[in-house]
């Protein structure tokens, strides 16, 4: 029972870390990467689909992405979706190829991005702590129902705290890596 609660908590903590990594991947550093456009959705025959399902997205160079739609009718729709996204990008269409040039980051914008990733990291830490709190309340409930002893409950709380500390450290490591990549010129 205790192992099940700990395992369940660890799985939830892994999901929080993966969610944080996903959020970090959408915040661009100095290099172009196709994942930058993952959050853009296109109206494709009445349904909203990710850009990657209607076009091939590739990196042309360190500052340029290239989107090649599979249907030529979609060129203007994709271009409009990229322009209206909150990414601040201006696509250029040449024939059926859309090129997206990424402007260099200013020091001010880098500072804003660092603030954003710190907020995301803090949200992840809060999620991890909430998972720990839920596990501890489950342990207390088991203790109250006399399914486990005080010693077992104390050990379980100690173990879940060690797991929590480990995941908080992972968040810090990911935050530091992302912060370094954003501040790199």
Swiss-Prot record:
One of its GO terms (biological process) is cytoplasmic translational termination. Keywords: Cytoplasm, Protein biosynthesis. GO terms for molecular function: ribosomal large subunit binding. Disulfide bonds: none annotated. It is found in: Cytoplasm. The keyword Transcription does not apply. Belongs to the RRF family. Responsible for the release of ribosomes from messenger RNA at the termination of protein biosynthesis. May increase the efficiency of translation by recycling ribosomes from one round of translation to another. This is Ribosome-recycling factor. The lineage of its organism: Bacteria, Pseudomonadati, Pseudomonadota, Gammaproteobacteria, Candidatus Pseudothioglobaceae.
